[in-house]
Amino acid sequence: MDTGKEKDRLDTENPSLIAGNTKQQATSQSSESKTKLAVEKDTDPPLPSRPTTRSATGRSKAAPDTVLSIRHASKNVLQSKPTTAVSLQDINSQTFQEGSNDIYSLLGARSGNEEAIKSKCSLSRPGSGKESDAADSASIKSVIPGEGTPVEVGSIFGDFTGAGQPQPLWDTKRKQVNIFDRSEPGLEDDDLSLDFESEFDCVEDIAADDNGDKILEEWRQKRKHYFILSAAGKPIYTRHGDDGLISPYIAIIQTIISFHQESSNPLKSFSAGRTKIVILSQGPLHLVAISRLLESDSQLRNQLDALYMQILSTLTLPALQHIFAVRPSTDLRRPLQGTESLLSSLADSFTKGSPSTLVSALECLKLRKSYRQQINSILLKSRVEPLLYGLVVAGGRLVSVIRPKKHSLHPGDLQLIFNMIFEADGVKAGGGESWIPICLPGFNSRGYLYMYVSFLDLHDHLPEDDKDINKDDAVAIILISADKESFFVLREMRDSVVQELEKSNSKNIIRAAIEKGRPATTDIVPGTVLRHFLYKSKSNVQFTMSSYSPDFTTLVARRRLLSTYHGLHSSVHSKNTHVKVQHCASRFMNSLAWVTPNFELYCVASPNSNRNALSQSANKIAQWVQQEDERVFIIGGAVF
């Protein structure tokens, strides 16, 4: 056989030898101590001989000296060009609306002649010359071919700066690894239209005049359903429809659940086209959510858990367990009679989009620190012995809270309280007072507390007929006690608090803060491309956000915004990803999620906005919240 052809064939069979000798050539050229040939001549030294042996199978093998040379070279240099290959955890599969799948890297596609990743490219702590390798784990990893362990290049963002001079959180001027070389595929848009407002209309009962087909079609058009049934298959609650309409579907759901209950891995969720069905089993109850909106399994499960807590707030856990232990086929609708409006208002808030439920945090009314401390002092000064918790709440936003030193309120419990007072009918606003026994499952699911609720009349100038003000403008004083005989004592405390609020002008301060509303994005960052943002402080379990006006004032626009946040939240909190930032584009808006150990930031801009402008605005929003944290958050609160 011709010697040249044999040489080409051997090169084809063992290409690693070519790479090894090429690297060996580069090494010998750069090292004066190992060879003088590269110094004396301008041309590259000739390739060394390639001794080979033939194996029993006919394949060529490198001589031992050559193999050792290749292994030695691999310890000092990369075996290929600089790479930004990522682990499988950084690869996502995006399903488009037309049904096709696209596997894409969260780091984006890279050009072949991109510069190698150097140590100076890794993002260091703002204001520090050292790389940040502690608080924030890396999201970009460089993998050396042939090595099993990925090598961390550095954090995407520096550590969140603490007290002191505000520093850039996201240094957009430094040379960084660009994770946005390729835009993420857009999140699927909700199938929303102007008829979304009819989502909350009641479905008529099926009558005897054979209107079943029409009612059934109307029921099927609903984008979201909630069912609660007992383990025996008895219907307890449904958001839409009566017993005659939902009974066949309850039977189907019960059959599916029972079929999987015998296995060690019971059914939790499944999908049918764009419809997602999530099941939450809690003791003797099954809670089911059926949704065609853009929500993940975990988000729907959190909503079902809130509905379950609403039931416990009425019955307590021991009472619920006792009812079904005595009679498993009990119809629970009788003990829950009168609470359907609470369940429905809570369910509707999820369908409209609830930022509080999404991020599992509370929103506070923006006030100066000195004003809030003044209100705290009034509550502490007026405190009576039976008081456990004292709160001032404006339209679902916390103004002030006093609590025992070793106790704090669960966000889910406060959500139940706010839903009962501000969302559901029955608690009169405009100066009325109520005495409500309530179980707070996050505090103690086995007993009742007693809640005194009284609304402040901020609009003394209004006529008596106009006292029913908007729920967003209502201010409530909520006093909670474990003593069921403390109504009159708490009423006296309320009178004292109101008197002091008027004397110190705090009442007018609260009214002015409500009328001012949430800040617009342009008030914070003039000329910004942002239309809305949602910021959660993890340490305070609180969030703040910008005004819905002017872009998200309608019900459809607000739901579309929250659906975008749901998609971002699901993406960055997925079990199989360590992504700290996510950028998505859709036909309605560009969106960005940014997650650090200290905060979560979600923001949206117009679909034609620039990505760099979006990221720079997000950085400025984070800096603004850091500067205003004692105004937008209640840090610690008042304790006794």
Curated annotation (Swiss-Prot):
UniProt KW Lipid metabolism keyword: no
Pfam families, A to Z: Fuz_longin_1, Fuz_longin_2, Fuz_longin_3
Location relative to the cell: Endosome, Multivesicular body membrane; Prevacuolar compartment membrane; Vacuole membrane
Region (Disordered): 1-66
GO biological process: autophagy; protein targeting to vacuole; vesicle-mediated transport
Similarity comment text for this entry: Belongs to the MON1/SAND family.
Protein purpose: In complex with CCZ1, is required for multiple vacuole delivery pathways including the cytoplasm to vacuole transport (Cvt), autophagy, pexophagy and endocytosis. The MON1-CCZ1 complex acts at the fusion of vesicles with the vacuole, through its regulation of the SNARE complex during the coordinated priming and docking stages of fusion, and particularly at the stage of tethering/docking.
Protein name as annotated: Vacuolar fusion protein MON1
Name of the coding gene: MON1
